[in-house]
A protein has these predicted regions:
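N-terminal Rossmann NAD(P)H-binding glycine-rich loop of SDR-like oxidoreductase domains
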Residues: 3-23
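SDR active-site strand-loop-helix element
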Residues: 6, 31, 68-72, 111-117, ...
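Conserved glycine-rich Rossmann-like NAD(P)H-binding loop of the short-chain dehydrogenase/reductase
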Residues: 25-34
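Rossmann-fold cofactor-recognition segment
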Residues: 42-52
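NAD(P)H-binding glycine-rich loop region in Rossmannoid oxidoreductase-like domains
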Residues: 50-90
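Conserved mid-core alpha-helix of short-chain dehydrogenase/reductase
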Residues: 55, 96-100, 218-221
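Catalytic helix-loop patch of NAD(P)-dependent Rossmann-fold dehydrogenases
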Residues: 82-97, 109-110, 118-166, 173
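NAD(P)-dependent short-chain dehydrogenase/reductase
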Residues: 123-129, 151-212, 216-221
Length: 222
């Protein structure tokens, strides 16, 4: 079986590729942006601009994958406030480009779209634990783009009969995560304090927020 991992240069990509090759025995191709540095000895790595539908169509026709894992995203909530246009372009336009490219294929692969627990937004009292059909109330730009991606997946599935699966994954943690994310940031601060690079104070944001965290290796296994 052939798998195509779109946007494999981030945190989750290497873990997913390792699972697909070592545990599933798949032949894997991974895409990255031109600026990203990504070397893998267990997969073929190719450059792809998710905003260029012509590139996507060409890649899909050449690879003829059985499965597509769409990881390409601007995935920082904080950065989505700083650059909403880029977040919307990558997360929404990029998703539309992929789905429209899949629609043009004779061989229709199964597509996995990665949503976010952020889509649920502000949870009301009595709604926990959250279930899949809980009301979606995006509270930030990143969450809104992921909710839109979810709706686009359903629309393309219903209208064109595409085999699309969607998940709303909650916060991932694990080795090699960048300090852009909260747990990795806390860990980096602790390490810097131990090495004398930072005063013995951990700087935090809103500690009243409640989140579920899942090890990235458990996420890709699921």
């Amino acid at each position: 079986m052939k798998a195509l991992v779109i946007g494999g240069g981030g945190f989750v990509g290497p873990y997913l590729v390792r699972h697909l090759t070592d545990d599933c025995g798949y032949e894997v191709t991974v895409t990255k942006t031109e600026k990203e540095q990504l070397v893998m000895d267990n997969a073929v790595v190719k450059n792809l601009d998710i905003l260029d539908i012509g590139q996507i169509v060409g890649l899909l026709k050449a690879e003829q994958p059985d499965y597509i894992f769409h990881l390409a995203a601007q995935s920082s909530v904080a950065y989505s406030w700083k650059n909403p246009t880029l977040t919307i372009d990558v997360n929404i336009k990029g998703c539309v480009n992929l789905l429209d490219a899949v629609r043009q294929l004779d061989k229709k692969p199964r597509v996995l779209l990665i949503g976010s627990g952020e889509e649920y937004g502000h949870i009301k009292e009595g709604e926990c634990p959250i279930v899949e059909d809980n009301t979606v109330r995006p509270g930030n730009i990143y969450a809104a783009t992921k909710a839109c991606q979810n709706m686009l997946g359903k629309i393309y599935s219903d209208a064109y009969g595409l085999d699309i699966m969607m998940v709303r994954a909650f916060n991932h943690i694990g080795p090699n995560q960048t300090p852009m994310f909260v747990v990795a940031d806390f860990c980096k601060q602790v390490a810097d304090i131990e090495k004398g690079r930072q005063e013995p104070v951990i700087y935090v944001g809103n500690l009243s927020a409640k989140r579920d965290f899942t090890d990235v290796r458990d996420v890709v296994n699921a």
